[in-house]
Amino acid sequence: MSQPQSSQVTKRGLTDPERAAIIAAAVPDHALDTQRKYHYFIQPRWKPLSEYEQLSCYAQPNPDWIAGGLDWGDWTQKFHGGRPSWGNESTELRTTDWYRHRDPARRWHHPYVKDKSEEARYTQRFLAAYSSEGSIRTIDPYWRDEILNKYFGALLYSEYGLFNAHSSVGRDCLSDTIRQTAVFAALDKVDNAQMIQMERLFIAKLVPGFDASTDVPKKIWTTDPIYSGARATVQEIWQGVQDWNEILWAGHAVMIATFGQFARREFFQRLATVYGDTLTPFFTAQSQTYFQTTRGAIDDLFVYCLANDSEFGAHNRTFLNAWTEHYLASSVAALKDFVGLYAKVEKSRADRSRRRLRGAAASSAIGRSITPDKIGFRVDVDQKVDAVLAGYKN
């Protein structure tokens, strides 16, 4: 049988009228918490606070010794050798707040999946109409079998390699908004690779004997001099770099902005219609949309947040300039190899004049893509274009 509580035990509890009165008297007569918004700790980029920011910011553990973090303490688990789950030593760049970055497109999981679903539906409608119209008959067989199937097919390995380069970025980056930008950019790259193979498989269904296997494109990517420089650059970014900021900058601000844009837009997309190919531009247009979306996010991260950081801006621009110098040289070498592909297309159809190529290389591949004024980088465009055109063969 339970024993009744003593008066001493009872007086220790909050039910004791005397103690309750003391507590009530000590409570201020004004509101204890004047901040009634749940996300008061998020600094909004836009007004009001966007859904993207509410669902993205500070989801990742954020100790205060990582700039911008709001928590405290150390990690309960670490990698072998003592490396922390996340740490400032993962990059050479510095900032007063890693959580300042915002994707201008405000992409998070739901709108990203929604956009991809819409793309899949209109792609299905386009391919059904293309097949029904018999539009495949307008493609020049040489372009279809030799250039499109083999060399455009080989480009998927460049896209896939750059996709894989993001794997460590998605793990090591120091804020959740940067992680979303990196992961969505990575998924767009693998989407590009899949679209190239989708086009080849689609053609194989319409053209008897068309080989849609990846054996020949893989051999071209790994052995053909056309892709020698591109392959070396992609391999370096993917396997030779530890700094996650360097991977993002080298890949998106330099390699993709130069070699990727020239190969995809200036060669395959521009020449496709000359050879009666209206199929390839449909897919490359989607890739160009991905490029522009990611470009806005990369610009926000590296220019707005890092190059213009109030305390570490000069430090960061030093590294961005060094990285640009290094990877621009590699990308120019890749372009020099790639323009040799013009020797495989007919002069009368390719508009292969040296002036035409010089303009394409200067304006779209080097001049506008690097945006040197934003980080203080200086480049001799004419010298770089001359280096590219050294690989041009009449």
From Swiss-Prot:
GO terms for molecular function: methane monooxygenase [NAD(P)H] activity. One of its GO terms (biological process) is one-carbon metabolic process. The keyword Glycoprotein does not apply. InterPro entries: Ferritin-like_SF, MethMoxA_beta, MP_mOase_hydro, Phenol_Hydrox, RNR-like. It catalyses: methane + NADH + O2 + H(+) = methanol + NAD(+) + H2O; methane + NADPH + O2 + H(+) = methanol + NADP(+) + H2O. It holds the Pfam family Phenol_Hydrox. Gene3D superfamilies: Ribonucleotide Reductase, subunit A. Keywords: Monooxygenase, NADP, One-carbon metabolism, Oxidoreductase. NCBIfam families: MethMoxAlphaMmoY. Responsible for the initial oxygenation of methane to methanol in methanotrophs. It also catalyzes the monohydroxylation of a variety of unactivated alkenes, alicyclic, aromatic and heterocyclic compounds. This is Methane monooxygenase component A beta chain. The gene is mmoY.
